[in-house]
UniProtKB/Swiss-Prot annotation, chain A:
This is AP-3 complex subunit beta. HEAT repeats lie at residues 113-151, 153-186, 187-224, 294-332, 521-559. Its main location: Golgi. Adaptor protein complex 3 (AP-3) is a heterotetramer composed of 2 large adaptins (APL5 and APL6), a medium adaptin (APM3) and a small adaptin (APS3). It comes from Eremothecium gossypii (strain ATCC 10895 / CBS 109.51 / FGSC 9923 / NRRL Y-1056) (Yeast). Keywords: Cytoplasmic vesicle, Golgi apparatus, Membrane, Protein transport, Repeat, Transport. It is a peripheral membrane protein. Residues 699-712 have a biased composition (Polar residues). The keyword Protein transport applies. One of its GO terms (biological process) is protein targeting to vacuole. The keyword Membrane applies. Residues 694-713, 731-781 are annotated as: Disordered.
UniProtKB/Swiss-Prot annotation, chain B:
SUPFAM superfamilies: Second domain of Mu2 adaptin subunit (ap50) of ap2 adaptor, SNARE-like. GO terms for cellular component: AP-3 adaptor complex; clathrin adaptor complex; cytoplasmic vesicle; cytoplasmic vesicle membrane; Golgi apparatus. Keywords: Cytoplasmic vesicle, Golgi apparatus, Membrane, Protein transport, Transport. It is found in: Golgi apparatus; Cytoplasmic vesicle membrane. Adaptor protein complex 3 (AP-3) is a heterotetramer composed of 2 large adaptins (APL5 and APL6), a medium adaptin (APM3) and a small adaptin (APS3). Belongs to the adaptor complexes medium subunit family. Residues 191-450 form the MHD domain. Part of the AP-3 complex, an adaptor-related complex which is not clathrin-associated. The complex is associated with the Golgi region as well as more peripheral structures. It facilitates the budding of vesicles from the Golgi membrane and may be directly involved in trafficking to the vacuole. It comes from Eremothecium gossypii (strain ATCC 10895 / CBS 109.51 / FGSC 9923 / NRRL Y-1056) (Yeast). This is AP-3 complex subunit mu. Pfam families: Adap_comp_sub (PF00928). It is a peripheral membrane protein. The lineage of its organism: Eukaryota, Fungi, Dikarya, Ascomycota, Saccharomycotina.
Length: 781, 451
């Protein structure tokens, strides 16, 4: 098939005597590639001809060429020079051409504002087109022309279109207002505000979605605007667009913290007074508790559960954030959001960049309460297809989830990873996680120490960075119980000369040996003797530690000296070694080393040995492994998240004294009676049945008078703005109105059918009955 | 707030760019800015104080999507938008995967789609049916030629060109007949067809303990894709036989209304064209009986035995392919064998294979046992080999593989045993005889067997 097509294509291409138009028609019909070749042949000379042609097809070919030039970053044709030719097509009959001109204007209008203004007239004319998509496009194009003198005109058109009968246009109004706001800022607040209020009260979920976006970007502080809509929005949450769902959750978190009473926590094991939900997620002092939510907050939290099946990762994470900010770990666990988050992390069809962000969120929750994900720890074992970043975050999560019961599995898994993984940064993270496992019990600690020693000394050609990290883990483990691990220290000291170690590994070993002076003084002098000749070749950190080791050794030697004579630095071997180190350090490049040398020199020269003992032999506290984050003080910066992730999880404070606010639903603006068609009610009618049923199931929600904000059927006729709108329309334009009436009548039958349908579609036979009614329709037509 | 969107191949050659303002940098300018940084390999690079460049690699053909945008409240938004854009392109062009050529040929459509999706620098529309309405897709001759074989007789009968093209006809009135926001109004097809594709990917880590395998960690990641070419506004009822899996945490397309039976019965008014109906994950380690855990791994199980033979230095890999009437053959079976570090002089020697051939690798830590395109079900391929020590150290301890990675795919049944019970269509125009197709595809993703 493909071959025959190629033959046809080549036949057409060889037909040189065909006119340009005929060739274009023929080859463009044949397939994209041949059309692309034809399109490529359009150059700077022939482009104006096409753009100015009387034939729509030629104009379209010309515009397609312009689009592909813009898209490919190709600068062989200067598109600015054809500005007028292109923009004059804004009045084309073909909507696609108009769209393409609009794309062009978006990018180039600012380069040529005077010419761009010429197009305004035809754009404004299409604002009253009968097709709502065209009206919306006109509004969009108008506002995309980024010229300050246009703003009053746009604002004027918006005031007219904000009550347009089509939700597509009203959505566009919200987006256009956002554009204006981004340009003009707070100065046009008085103009925008009434329109925003009307958009927020819209009955169409798609308009509410756009209005919420405008609200979040422009007036996020004006939460009081939402009082009357709060309950209705909770019920239509799952009908909004996915992006709007995430935005609404974000807005409502802020709203709940500002205006809703704080939840109370009651200890179920005793009769103590209920306390307020603590600011931080993990600070509830009772082992078993119940949380009592305000019923409006409960309404929001239960409406979130409808979103647990969302395929959108952003929505799932937003839902989890809402539970994290507004509720307790218990509610978080009961809500089922844990499963939804886990589903995202194991899915094979979600790209790794998104998985990584989901894992970062899980890491934040784990830090607050490890018990949330503890039973699912196996889900965080590394998989071969995981990227480096995913692996690192999984390891961090594992290091938090590790406990007595799962330690065995996790350690085994980590050992396997250490043996097969190639990436250095993952291996470093593995050693960090192991050090956390080692803190679980002394049994694990000794097992991990011997395993680490094995790994380091078996001559595997692994990265030096990894060796350094393993040595550091080893050092911190040994320090916990020095006497038990003398043999390990001896092995480590041998590594100083046998292995080619990084400075970041060498310096800690030398430091560790210095700490061992009191425990086992016999090892150190020999190590120091071997280090001194290499002094000048070492890294600054290592040099500093060598000097410290010499000083510690000397200080210990002085303390343990029991002779009658005063200790003489000049004659003792250790004293001489110290002098040598001092001599080397005094001429060091590094300021730090010289400074330390001077300080130590003056202490020992003036024979202030007590000070030296205090300074150099003080017992050091045992370091907590670096990964054991934030048990008490919650600090996200230790987790190494992306910066915007950190901002995202900043905890909002609860308002200590929320103002009394009235959340009785306010009037909804329903434009559906103005529409050409009524059939969408069959869908929303069906959903309304569902909504009024749903609250009955959960006792907490049923207390809300649900029908006042869900069913708006009865109210449609009472709306005042309806009459106003019609009088407005008839004054403005009479022809489209007549058109409307005709279509309205012709479709009214349909409405009756669909209304019946929504009434009967509660039982199982709904599909059957609707099938019957649709066939009736067929016959009546 | 988005400033520009770019698509490149994995070598950063520009395929398509879309700039939302006149000040937005072209990809060339941007490239020179991030050229010096290693961090360009990261998914997010900060360009200036409040501008970041987000990157997402998609699909086997490794298209890279880039978005330059101002930091917004939600850290997932830019990545999510890039994923949505990719999904929209897939659904819009109705393809399994996108090629660079397809994108270059359709630069105008890519721009128009983005023009509709982004407004005021924010995400406005992401629904693919709505986008197809705004940017109508004109089916070219090749589409007709492709479908001609099947429907030649039908196509000739209907002389009307609109029906000839077999594509939904966009009417001027947008809302006329639109029942649900996600479905294009007034779809008309000559052949009413609905295809349901169930895909499952096995991700599992197993350990060989003696002669038996134990599951360390595993999950099945499943997806239900639907291709729907139905006239009017039909309602579809899809009943699944879930074989005891709860599927509670599934992700569902917004069109799905759950019945009393949960995910097992889904009622929906489908969007037109291609879409993902549901995604689910089955945690294998949560299944309580050990035997059931292993049966849910699918048709192919691999075991690894070592320390065999006269010198106790041989290993044997045995692939047990279960028998099934629904599956014709296993496709693209490959087993990658990983060895611990072996010295340079040692040699991997294959003693015997019943199927396929051995491909060694320069890295010395792995080799691949590659099978033919198709392997019959019910067969038990075996490979036996050893790592020969160099002559200088003949008595070194024998080396055995540390783990195996298995990859394969087959059609016909799913590892979890989930099947479609019925697809019931209602509200179709009278007289239409819809065609319903169901396809099951299984794949091995991260399937590891450790020694």
């Amino acid at each position: 098939m493909a071959e025959s097509m190629q033959r046809i294509a080549s036949a057409f291409e060889s037909a040189r005597d065909l006119t340009l138009e005929a060739a274009a028609v023929a080859s463009s019909r044949l397939g994209e590639s041949s059309y692309f070749h034809y399109s490529k042949s359009i150059d700077s000379e022939s482009l104006p001809g096409l753009l100015n042609s009387r034939y729509t097809r030629e104009v379209r070919d010309g515009m397609k060429r312009v689009m592909s030039l813009m898209g490919s970053g190709d600068s062989s044709i200067e598109l600015e020079t054809h500005f007028a030719d292109i923009v004059k097509n804004i009045g084309s009959d073909d909507v696609k051409v108009r769209r393409m001109v609009s794309v062009y204007l978006l990018r180039y209008a600012e380069t040529n504002p005077n010419l761009a203004l010429l197009s305004i007239n035809s754009i404004q004319r299409s604002l009253s087109d009968s097709n709502p998509d065209v009206r919306a496009l006109a509004l969009k194009t108008l506002s995309d022309i980024n010229i300050a003198s246009l703003y009053p005109i746009i604002l004027h058109s918006l005031k007219k279109t904000v009550i347009d009968s089509s939700e597509v246009v009203r959505c566009q109004v919200a987006m256009t207002l956002l554009k204006l706001f981004k340009e003009q800022g707070i100065s046009i607040k008085d103009d925008v505000m009434p329109m925003l209020k009307s958009l927020l009260a819209d009955s169409e979920p798609s308009v509410v979605s756009a209005a919420l976006l405008l609200f979040q970007k422009a007036f996020a502080q004006e939460l009081q605007l939402l009082h009357g809509h709060y309950r209705r929005y909770c019920s239509i949450l799952n009908q909004l667009t996915e992006n709007a769902q995430a935005i609404m959750i974000d807005i409502f978190i802020a709203y709940a913290k500002e205006y809703l009473p704080r939840p109370m926590v009651r200890d179920t094991s005793s009769d103590a007074e209920a306390i307020q939900l603590p600011d931080s997620f993990n600070q509830i002092p009772f082992p078993v508790y119940d949380v009592e939510y305000d019923h409006d907050l409960n309404l929001f939290l239960s409406s979130l559960k409808k979103l647990l099946h969302s395929p959108n990762a952003m929505v799932i994470v937003a839902v989890s954030k809402a539970f994290y900010q507004l509720s307790s770990p218990k509610t978080f666990k009961d809500s089922g959001i844990v499963d939804s988050l886990l589903r995202l992390t194991v899915s094979s069809y979600i790209c790794s960049e998104i998985k990584e962000l989901v894992l970062q969120s899980i890491l934040v929750y784990c830090c607050s309460d490890p018990s949330l994900f503890r039973s699912h720890y196996k889900r965080f074992f590394l998989m071969p297809s995981d990227t480096e970043n995913i692996s690192i975050f999984k390891l961090k999560i594992l290091s938090i989830l590790v406990s007595d019961s799962n330690c065995k599995h996790i350690v085994n898994e980590l050992k396997f990873v250490a043996g097969t993984e190639q990436s250095a940064s993952i291996l470093v993270e593995v050693s960090n996680t192991l050090s956390v496992c080692a803190q679980i019990s002394s049994k694990w600690s000794s097992q991990i120490i011997s395993w680490l020693l094995d790994r380091i000394s078996s001559n595997t050609p692994i990265d030096k960075e990894v060796t350094a990290s393993q040595i550091n883990v080893l050092r911190s483990l040994i320090q916990k119980d020095p006497i038990k691990h003398i043999a390990t220290v001896v092995k480590l000291s041998k590594m100083l000369s046998n292995h080619d170690l990084l400075p970041s590994a060498k310096a800690p070993i030398i430091w560790l040996l210095g700490e061992y002076v009191q425990v086992e003084p016999r090892i150190c002098p020999d190590v120091l003797r071997r280090l001194l000749p290499q002094f000048s070749k070492e890294h600054a950190h290592v040099r500093l530690q060598i000097l410290n080791l010499a000083a510690k050794l000397l200080s210990h030697d002085v303390d343990s000296y029991s002779g009658d004579m005063e200790y003489d630095i000049g004659t003792s071997r250790i004293g001489q070694m110290f002098e040598a180190a001092l001599q080397l350090a005094k001429f060091d490049d590094e300021y730090d080393v010289r400074d330390r040398a001077r300080m130590l020199a003056s202490i020992f020269e003036q024979k202030r040995y007590e000070i030296a003992t205090l300074l150099l032999q003080a017992p050091k506290p045992y370091p907590m492994a670096s990964l054991n984050y934030c048990r008490d003080s919650f600090n996200l910066s230790a987790l190494n998240l992306y910066p915007d992730m950190e901002n995202y999880y900043e905890l909002l404070p609860w308002n200590a004294d929320p103002q009394a606010s009235d959340r009785t639903p306010c009037e909804v603006k329903d434009y559906s009676k103005l529409k050409n068609s009524f059939s969408s009610s069959s869908y929303f009618g069906r959903n309304e049945v569902e909504f009024t049923n749903k609250p009955k199931r959960s006792a907490s929600v049923s207390s809300v008078p649900s029908n006042t904000f869900t069913s708006s059927h009865g109210k449609k006729y009472q709306l005042q703005s309806l009459d106003e709108f019609f009088s407005d329309v008839s004054a403005r334009q009479s022809v489209p109105k007549a058109k409307r009436v005709i279509i309205e009548e012709s479709t009214s039958e349909e409405t009756d059918h669909t209304d019946d349908e929504s009434g009967s579609s509660s039982g199982d036979e709904s599909t059957e009955s609707s099938y019957v009614s649709s066939s009736e329709e067929e016959t009546t037509e | 707030m988005y400033t520009s969107i770019y698509i490149t191949d994995s070598k950063k050659n520009l395929v398509f760019e879309y700039l939302l303002t006149s000040q937005a940098p072209t990809f060339q300018q941007l490239c020179s800015k991030i050229a010096g940084r290693d961090a360009a390999m990261d998914a997010m690079v900060a360009i200036s104080k409040d501008m970041s460049l987000y990157r997402q690699a998609v699909g086997p053909e490794k298209l890279w999507y880039w978005a330059l945008c101002q930091a917004c409240g939600d850290p997932l938004e830019p990545q999510m938008f890039l994923a949505q854009y990719h999904q929209v392109l897939i659904e819009y062009f109705d393809k399994e995967a996108l090629t660079v050529k397809k994108l270059v040929n359709n630069a105008d459509r890519l721009a128009l789609l983005l023009h509709a999706m982004l407004d005021a620098g924010e995400v406005a529309v992401t629904d693919s049916n709505r986008l197809r309405q705004l940017v109508p897709l004109r089916n070219d001759l090749s589409t007709i030629l492709n479908s001609a074989t099947k429907t030649l007789a039908n196509t000739v009968k209907y002389a009307d060109s609109k029906q000839l093209f077999g594509a939904p006809v966009a009417t001027g009135k947008v809302e006329a007949g639109q029942t649900v926001p996600w479905r294009t109004a007034d779809c008309r097809y000559v052949n009413n067809e609905i295809y349901v594709d169930l895909v499952e990917t096995v991700n599992a880590t197993l350990r060989q303990k003696g002669s038996s395998l134990t599951l360390i960690n595993g999950s099945l990641s499943g997806k239900i894709d639907v291709k729907c070419y139905l006239s009017g506004n039909p309602t579809v009822q899809l009943k699944l036989r879930t074989s005891g899996h709860p599927l509670d945490n599934s992700a569902l397309h917004r069109c799905v209304e759950l019945g009393e039976a949960g995910v097992a019965t889904m009622n929906f008014v489908p969007p037109d064209g291609r879409f993902t109906l549901a995604e689910y994950a089955i945690d294998l380690s949560a299944i309580s009986q050990a035997a059931r855990r292993l049966t849910n791994l699918g048709l192919v199980t691999v075991s690894l035995a070592s320390g065999l033979g006269q010198h106790r230095d041989e290993f044997e890999i045995k692939v047990i392919i279960g028998n099934s009437t629904q599956v014709a053959a296993i496709e693209d079976l490959r087993i990658t064998v990983y060895f611990p570090d072996i010295s340079d002089a040692a040699k991997i020697k294959i003693l015997r294979t019943t199927h396929g051939g051995w491909e060694s690798d320069l890295s010395r830590v792995r080799g691949v046992w590659a099978f033919d395109k198709q392997t019959a079900v019910g067969s038990v391929p075996v490979l036996r080999g050893c790592v020969e020590n160099p002559e200088s150290t003949p008595h070194a301890p024998p080396v055995f593989p540390s783990h195996l990675a298995v990859s394969y795919s087959h059609v016909g049944q799913l590892p979890s045993g989930i099947r479609v019970d019925t697809i019931a269509l209602s509200d179709l125009p009278p007289g239409s005889k819809p065609f319903k197709g169901v396809k099951y595809t299984s794949r091995a993703g991260d399937y590891i067997v450790r020694a």
